[in-house]
């Protein structure tokens, strides 16, 4: 049976013992995809970044190494956020980024409505949310749209090649990179994770 990725109880139990884990790809690999877009933002303004479902990833530390301190890490499990603070403090000696308890499918309840971001990222959080069905994923997308600044966009890494094939999605979607999955045998077929760039549509 698949894990109950959409249930908070699953993550509470998991994060009780898990201190660090990277979904689908290392933060370094994901950051290599994000970096050109981040550089484009930073040429015009300091970047305000929202990471959805930060879990026990160290992705936020990569943003800080790039000089980005206006980073808000969101997870609905407080234990995950404590792990994030620990990872930041271990790397830099202090904690300067934000860690906010919020449900990514109800962002308007967890973040002030006027809180806007130039860049929203998630590393397979969309896959966990999708376990609860299309309605939950659309709620997540609507919340992201509401919290994007003008010209802002969302970069999402997913195991699915059709993750955002949804009606009423408030975004135009483009696959900007594919990451090969590990093979058990050389003869295994090529399978890729998809990295999506989502920009608000005009509908």
Please place each PLM-identified region on the residue numbering.
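Class I SAM-dependent methyltransferase SAM/SAH-binding core
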Residues: 50, 55-107
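Conserved beta-strand signature within the Rossmann-like core of class I S-adenosyl-L-methionine
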Residues: 151-158
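N-terminal, positively charged/glycine-rich alpha-helical extensions of SAM-dependent methyltransferases
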Residues: 1-20, 25-28
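A short SAM/SAH-binding and catalytic strip from SAM-dependent methyltransferases
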Residues: 118-134
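Class I S-adenosyl-L-methionine
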Residues: 163-203
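Conserved alpha-helix/loop element of class I SAM-dependent methyltransferases that forms part
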Residues: 24-45
């Amino acid at each position: 049976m698949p894990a109950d990725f959409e249930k908070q109880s699953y993550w509470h139990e998991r994060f009780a013992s898990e201190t660090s884990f990277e979904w689908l790809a290392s933060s370094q690999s994901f950051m290599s995809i994000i970096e050109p877009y981040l550089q484009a933002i930073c040429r015009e303004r300091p970047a305000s970044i929202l990471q959805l479902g930060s879990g026990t990833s160290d992705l936020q530390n990569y943003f800080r190494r790039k000089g980005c301190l206006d980073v808000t890490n969101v997870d609905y499990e407080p234990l995950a956020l404590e792990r994030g603070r620990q990872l930041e403090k271990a790397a830099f000696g202090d904690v300067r980024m934000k860690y906010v308890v919020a449900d990514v499918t109800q962002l308007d309840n967890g973040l002030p409505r006027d809180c806007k971001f130039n860049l929203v990222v998630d590393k397979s959080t969309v896959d966990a949310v999708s376990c609860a069905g299309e309605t939950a994923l659309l709620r997540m997308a609507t919340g992201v749209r509401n919290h994007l600044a003008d010209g802002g966009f969302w970069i999402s890494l997913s195991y699915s090649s059709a993750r955002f094939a949804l009606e009423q999605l408030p975004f135009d979607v483009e696959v900007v990179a594919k990451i090969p999955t590990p093979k058990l045998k050389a003869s295994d077929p090529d399978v890729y994770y998809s990295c999506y760039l989502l920009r608000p549509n005009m509908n």
